Amino acid sequence: MAFSTNGSEESELYHAQIHLYKHVYNFVSSMALKSAMELGIADAIHNHGKPMTLSELASSLKLHPSKVNILHRFLRLLTHNGFFAKTIVKGKEGDEEEEIAYSLTPPSKLLISGKPTCLSSIVKGALHPSSLDMWSSSKKWFNEDKEQTLFECATGESFWDFLNKDSESSTLSMFQDAMASDSRMFKLVLQENKRVFEGLESLVDVGGGTGGVTKLIHEIFPHLKCTVFDQPQVVGNLTGNENLNFVGGDMFKSIPSADAVLLKWVLHDWNDEQSLKILKNSKEAISHKGKDGKVIIIDISIDETSDDRGLTELQLDYDLVMLTMFLGKERTKQEWEKLIYDAGFSSYKITPISGFKSLIEVYP
């Protein structure tokens, strides 16, 4: 194919090439971030208490001298991507030369170990080989007439079976840590949306894992009788207190009764048919409360008309993650509305929260 020498067409071609190459090599930025997390760069700078020069950072990380220039090139990309910032500092005493030092930015502060907002386990889980290797089977998956996830097509087992085949596995622990770290971020949401839980006497957190979210709610509303409802192998060894109870069961069969049902990061794991069953069981769980009961959903509500292209891209990325791992989905407002009304609810309210998620209140 011959391309015109017209300047406009050449410019378009070059921009198209840049666009394609950028998306092809996006994985490099992800893996560089994972490397920074594994090395503990954010921890080193945080513990140092001030920006660190390249030599200080390499020394703190106990890197071989031959890796200092490699570290510089990783930091150059990560700084360009907004994870670190560069500043100029004076050299050591007696040295008049100035040096570049690296400091933390808001995104890299999310990698500081031990902080409630630490999301290192999210990075670790999302970029785990089990999450990445399956994509090599995508052509086979498209060409097979089987109702299975891409993960199943690649590994021969569902993600849940892979996760639960060994209750002591590091993979299960990593997944639980990732869910717990995301739940800790919920505290910010809770502080801004206390009204959602006011007036309630009881709440059941469906798929609540080890109870991270429920404990945060319980801190602010200690009178609230909370139940964490999850699979028996998840909650079997957990202990609560007078107002915090752990119950094992199957949300597709029934959900414990309460004034409100919380579904945080649950429905996007499932297709519409399965989600409809969960919502109907949730409606039954709050039936004793009449019109005063409600279901509280925290999930993504996709808005493809948003001016924030980065936000929309993240939401669409999540949609493909849910599809390929679970045959689940992220939903648009119209899809949420249909699902909610099909489950027999009378009204709902969607409030954007927490960056890319939404809080959806559903009423009988």
Curated annotation (Swiss-Prot):
- Record PROSITE patterns: SAM_OMT_II
InterPro entries in UniProt: COMT-like, O_MeTrfase_dom, Plant_O-MeTrfase_dimerisation, SAM-dependent_MTases_sf, WH-like_DNA-bd_sf, WH_DNA-bd_sf
Q: List the disulfide bonds.
A: none
Q: Where is the active site?
A: 268
Q: EC annotation?
A: 2.1.1.46, 2.1.1.212
Q: Does the keyword S-adenosyl-L-methionine apply?
A: yes
Name the GO terms of the biological process aspect.
methylation
Which reaction(s) are listed as its catalytic activity?
a 4'-hydroxyisoflavone + S-adenosyl-L-methionine = a 4'-methoxyisoflavone + S-adenosyl-L-homocysteine + H(+); (2R,3S)-2,4',7-trihydroxyisoflavanone + S-adenosyl-L-methionine = (2R,3S)-2,7-dihydroxy-4'-methoxyisoflavanone + S-adenosyl-L-homocysteine + H(+)
**Which of the seven top EC classes does this enzyme belong to?**
transferase
Q: Which keywords annotate this record?
A: Methyltransferase, S-adenosyl-L-methionine, Transferase
MF terms (GO), sorted A to Z: 2,7,4'-trihydroxyisoflavanone-4'-O-methyltransferase activity; isoflavone 4'-O-methyltransferase activity; O-methyltransferase activity; protein dimerization activity
| Pfam families according to UniProt | Dimerisation, Methyltransf_2
- Keyword Membrane among record annotations: no
Q: Which residues bind S-adenosyl-L-methionine?
A: 206-209, 230-231, 250-251, 264
Similarity comment: family membership = Belongs to the class I-like SAM-binding methyltransferase superfamily. Cation-independent O-methyltransferase family. COMT subfamily.
How does the record describe its quaternary structure?
A: Homodimer.
Task: Give the function comment from the record.
Answer: 2-hydroxyisoflavanone 4'-O-methyltransferase involved in the biosynthesis of the phytoalexin medicarpin. Has also an in vitro (+)-6a-hydroxymaackiain-3-0-methyltransferase activity, converting the pterocarpan 6a-hydroxymaackiain into pisatin. No activity with di- or trihydroxylated isoflavones, including daidzein and genistein, or with (-)-medicarpin and maackiain. The dual activity for either 3- or 4'-O-methylation depends upon substrate availability.
Stated name of the protein = Isoflavone 4'-O-methyltransferase
Q: Which organism is it from?
A: Medicago truncatula
Organism lineage reads as: Eukaryota, Viridiplantae, Streptophyta, Embryophyta, Tracheophyta
